[in-house]
């Protein structure tokens, strides 16, 4: 059976048909608008194999989000530096993802834990069309070190299977998107386990889907490689989604091609 390659197919499409555009970083991109990728999570964990993805950073970043944290100190204690380019001298990033997920401020001065609210709906009203978590808090964007790229996600239950769709307004296809796919696939597994469900699909929807001009050669190298089978995720049991640790996440049979380095556009 052929290995599904929706991510690599999108890279090819943007290389072939992308529009040349300027961008905030001054780097320049090739870009397409409104693209979608689908992964059946029951068929394997979608960790890209045409280059090695740094799984440690994926896992620790997700755990950091789930903590409601927005300072890189906790990441540093675990050897993860992926947010350093945007952090202040004290390590602060403002009210980014984790803060919005766990502590969205209301006009009355209270805070909403969106992750807990989503889990409650999955358990009590799985057919709800309102099982949504948003990081795009317009009133707080000026205080964020970087406005959310992966901004909004929705859960959907059918036949006892949990699916998740993410909307990513800005998609750095070479560096960011493989990371985002793995992160939200892992989150879907965690939410499914906590709600007593099996996993369904992860659906990634991208707005501005771009390849930076200084990533083109790296993308061509990646596309020259033969995809390999996706690995298997083994997730330990925890009583709460907020109790997971790095050691609870085990990926078996991940056999990627070597990593490919590229500069981050800041």
UniProtKB/Swiss-Prot annotation:
SUPFAM superfamilies cross-referenced by the UniProt entry: Thymidylate synthase/dCMP hydroxymethylase (SSF55831)
- Highest taxon of the lineage: Bacteria
Q: What is its EC number?
A: 2.1.1.45
List GO molecular-function terms, semicolon-separated. Answer: thymidylate synthase activity
In Pfam terms, one family for this protein is: Thymidylat_synt
**Enzyme kind, highest EC tier:** transferase
- One example of a Gene Ontology biological process annotation: dTMP biosynthetic process
* Chain sites annotated for binding dUMP: 24, 129-130, 169-172, 180, 210-212
UniProt keyword annotations, A-Z: Cytoplasm, Methyltransferase, Nucleotide biosynthesis, Transferase
What positions constitute the catalytic site?
149 (nucleophile)
Q: Name one GO cellular component term.
A: cytosol
Q: Which residues bind (6R)-5,10-methylene-5,6,7,8-tetrahydrofolate?
A: 54, 172, 265
Cellular localization per UniProt = Cytoplasm
Reactions catalysed, as given in the entry = dUMP + (6R)-5,10-methylene-5,6,7,8-tetrahydrofolate = 7,8-dihydrofolate + dTMP
Q: Which family does it belong to?
A: Belongs to the thymidylate synthase family. Bacterial-type ThyA subfamily.
Q: What does this protein do?
A: Catalyzes the reductive methylation of 2'-deoxyuridine-5'-monophosphate (dUMP) to 2'-deoxythymidine-5'-monophosphate (dTMP) while utilizing 5,10-methylenetetrahydrofolate (mTHF) as the methyl donor and reductant in the reaction, yielding dihydrofolate (DHF) as a by-product. This enzymatic reaction provides an intracellular de novo source of dTMP, an essential precursor for DNA biosynthesis.
Write down what this protein is called. Answer: Thymidylate synthase
**What is the organism field in this record?**
Mycolicibacterium paratuberculosis (strain ATCC BAA-968 / K-10) (Mycobacterium paratuberculosis)
